[in-house]
Amino acid sequence: MADWKGPRYDAGWLYRRIKWGTWDELGLYDNIESASINRSAFDTLKTSGSLKYFGTAPDEVDALALIYTFRDRNGETVEQRRATVLVESDEPDYTSLDGGGVRQSGSAKIYSLLKVLSDTKLKVPYTVAAGANAIAAANKIITGAGLRTNCQSSGYLLSCDHTFAPDNSLLDVVNYLLDAAGYGSADTDAYGAVILRPYVEPTARELAWTFANDETSTLMPGISSENDWRNTPNIIVLTYETDDETYVAQARNIDPESRASLPSRSWRENSTVEQVSELDGDTQDERLENLKALARKKLLDGSSEIQYTKVKTLLVPVEINDAAGVLYSGIKRQGAITSIDTSCTPTAETNIKIREFIRRDLLVDVTGQVIAV
C-alpha cells in the first residue's frame, strides 16, 4: 500500500492521451508545462481547471488523464490518476526566438466528461414515462452518449410522467432522474466513468482521511474556518401540482434558541420556495401529510449551521463528498469535502474545503393546505 504520509521522492505529473470511445491509454503529452484541477461538489460538471502547453495543443476529441506520481519511502512507485477530462484550447500565442524561428504556446480549459451531457440539448420535447426505472433510464442516456458508467442499480420507479423542454440538456434529465431516486447528482470517477450511487448523509460515511498536525501530517501551516448560519432559511415552502389541485406545505423555524429562527431574526425572513415533482400518497390527506413531512425535513436540514474548514495540504487520496476530519491544535472537526483545488506541481499543493452540518433539535411550525384548481 502506498505511503501518502511519509516523504515523497521524484514527484511529478504525467499527462496521458486517452482514446475517445475505446478509452485506451495512448502516448504521454510531453509539452504540458503546468495545470490545475478544481473539483467542486456544487459545480454541475464537478471538475474543471486549466493547463498551459507549448507546441501543438492537446487533442480536443480524445480525453486527457492527469496522473500524480511519486516514490514513497518504501521505494514503491505510486501513479494515481486524479482526473480524466476534455480539453478546450484558446487560440495559440507565437513568440519569436533568438536566431530565428517561432515558439507556439497556449492555454486551455479542462472539463469533466459530464460536459458531453451538458452540451447536448434535447432539441425536441422528451418525456420519461411513469413506471420507468429512474436509474436504468439515466444509465441508458449516459451510455447512449458514448460514456461509461459506474452504476449502482435501484428499484425506484417514477410515479408520473415528466416532460423536458427542447432546451434542456441530457445532464438536466440525468440529474432529475438521480434526484427522484434519492441519488446524488452525477459525477465522474478519476477514469471518466459517470458515477450513479445513492446519496449518503456525511455523518453516515466512513472517514476517508484525517488531517492532523502530528508526525504524519501532510498539512501546510494554518487552517481557516467560516460559519454560514446567516444564510440558512427559516421558512421552507413546498408545492406539488396535479391537473386538479395544488398542495402547499410551509415549515417555519420558530425556535428561540436558534440564531437563524424567526424569533431571533425578527424581520429578517429567509424563505425558500420549491416545487416537488414526485409525491407519494393514495389519498389527498396522505399526500398533504407527506408534503408537510418533507417540508419539515428540508427545514431541519437547511437550518443546520454550516461550518466550513479550509486546509492546505499535500495531495492525498480523497475525493469530493468523502468524509474527512481535522485535528489541529485543539480544533476537532468532521464533515464532507466540498472542494479540492490542486496545483499540478511536484508538491501538488492542494486546498481542501470541508463542510460540517451542525444539527440541533429545533422547534418547527408546519402548516399545509390543498387548493383546488
Question: Model features per residue range: what roles?
Answer:
Residues 1-10, 175, 200-347, 369-373:
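Acidic, small/polar-enriched beta strand-loop surface segments
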Residues 1-31:
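Polar/acidic, low-complexity leader/linker segments enriched in S/T/G and N/D
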Residues 2, 55-149:
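Surface-exposed cap/loop segments at beta↔alpha junctions
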Residues 2, 78, 94-117, 153-232:
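Short beta-strand-centered interaction patches in the first periplasmic/extracellular domains
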Residues 22-70, 116-117, 121, 128-132, ...:
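Extracellular/virion structural assembly segments
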Residues 37-56, 102-115, 238, 301-312, ...:
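Oligomerization/assembly interface segments of phage tail-like spikes and tubes
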Residues 135-139, 171-174, 235-236:
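Extracytoplasmic/secreted envelope proteins and their assembly/folding machinery
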Residues 358-373:
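Glycine- and charge-enriched low-complexity intrinsically disordered segments
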